[in-house]
Amino acid sequence: MHRGAANEHLPRTQFGTEIDPVGFRNTLRAIYGRYRLPLLITENGIGAFDKLEADGTINDQYRIDYLRAHIHQMQLAITDGVEILGYTPWSAIDLISTHQGCSKRYGLIYVNRDEFDLKDLRRIKKKSAYWYGEMIKRNGLTDAV
C-alpha cells in the first residue's frame, strides 16, 4: 500500500497529479539499487484536456515539457549507473480514461471524437508527436529538442 503527503512545491496536472521529474529519477535509482536489474519504463506521460484548434493543430506544450523533464532525469539516472532497457511515453494514441472518458487525453496522436459524438475519428499528430519524433531522430535530448 502506498501512502504519501502532498508536496505544495510541485506543479500539478489539470487532474491534480504531482509532476516530479526528480522524484522519477530517485525512484529509478531506488528500484535499480534494490533489484540490480535493467529497467523498462512504460507509460510515462501526462493526461490533459487537449484541444483541437481551428487550424487543425493540437498545441500540447505541457506534454512536451513533461516528457522533456522526465527524459532528462532518466538520462541523469543512467549517468548515475541505472541500466535502462527502454522508454515509452504514455501513450502513442489517445485512449479512454476510466474516470474522465474521452475528455482526458494521454497520447501523442489525437483522436477526433468526444464523449457523445464519434465525429470523423481522424488521427491528428499533436505538437508532442513531432517533438518526440525529432528527439528519436537525434537519439536523445539536445538543446534543439
Give the residues covered by each predicted segment:
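Non-catalytic scaffold segments within catalytic domains of secreted glycoside hydrolases
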Residues: 1-145
